[in-house]
Amino acid sequence: MTNPLVTIAIPSYNHAKYIGETIQSALDQTFQDFEILIVDDSSTDNTLEIIKKFTDSRIRLIVSEKNQGVCQTSNICIQNAQEKYIALIASDDIMEKTKLEKQINFLEQNSNYGAVFSGMEVIDENGVTNKKKTKKYTKIFEKENRSRFEWLKYFFHHGNCIAAPSLLAKTSALKETGNFNKIITQAHDLDLWIRLCLQGYEIHIIHEKLLKYRERNNNENLSSNTKDTRIRLLFDNEKVLKNFLKISSLNDFIKIFPDSSGASLQFFSKEEEKIIIDYLIFKEAYKNSPNHYHTQFAVSLLYETLQKDGAEEILNKNFGFDFNEYKKIITQNPLGVLLEKCNEPFSKKILKSFLKI
């Protein structure tokens, strides 16, 4: 008996009301060569009772002894997936019947692609379509397809535009790229897409709504638009940009940022090349991106780059950059500006004490 072609992986937690519908949508796929792997994150409701009502032999259940969060539960899914492909779906979402068929057909015909996504229809807690939010999410998540280098440029400047719940990927690609980073609480999906593209895999969006994404009341979704979520997302997005520091050649940098000023394929030593790449990444973040987290990332990167032996001389020789320019740049550090504004009386007091010395 041959192994199935795809693992439908369902990280599950306290979704007793919805998990049955999610499992049934998997069982109803037009493509039937699959196993269903459910990893329950120590649910405290009757989710497990609902799961165990399904007697299909293709269902495999792993129950965590303690609650670990969606990232780690998804990682357990990936680690335990044994088939060629893996489809990750939340335990309150619904797969359209042709989802697996269409996504697997694409990957089977395009061997250089590591993952394929789709659009999604937004439904409420009762399964009713929210047309307004579906239209909004269509604009966000059904972007024009492009090469992995072009995706990387988009991710760098604009952040995520991929519907994570629609993922179907090569299992080997996810295992090679590494797990979801559980320390990245809001942008762990973007973090993985960037690493996947940097690893050399192309990604693709099928512009059909192959998933029903459930938006819960009372901000119960991980991605709900709350103040806390927005703060965490800004923090995460700055950290996610650090993935771009893995770019090790000017050739790759130019493929991602072909319009970058000052980038040229002349000969440098390995040490010089890395300093120049990091400086060019600083420039991309500092001058060409609109968000404060880009500026915070850029200023921190410039500081780290200038710690390297000979960095100031290399940057001065190739870009005319000097220490006076660095001093001007760090005064625009968003965190510093914010702290100075919040603590203006204290800052003035400290400054006066220094001036007396």
Say what each PLM segment does.
Residues 22, 64-81, 94, 102:
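Glycine-rich, basic loop-to-helix element that forms the pyrophosphate-binding segment
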Residues 25, 40-49, 66, 90:
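A conserved acidic beta->alpha catalytic loop
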Residues 86:
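Short aromatic/hydrophobic "clamp" motif used to bind/position activated sugar donors
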Residues 156, 198, 214-357:
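C-terminal subregions of glycosyltransferases and related glycan-biosynthesis enzymes
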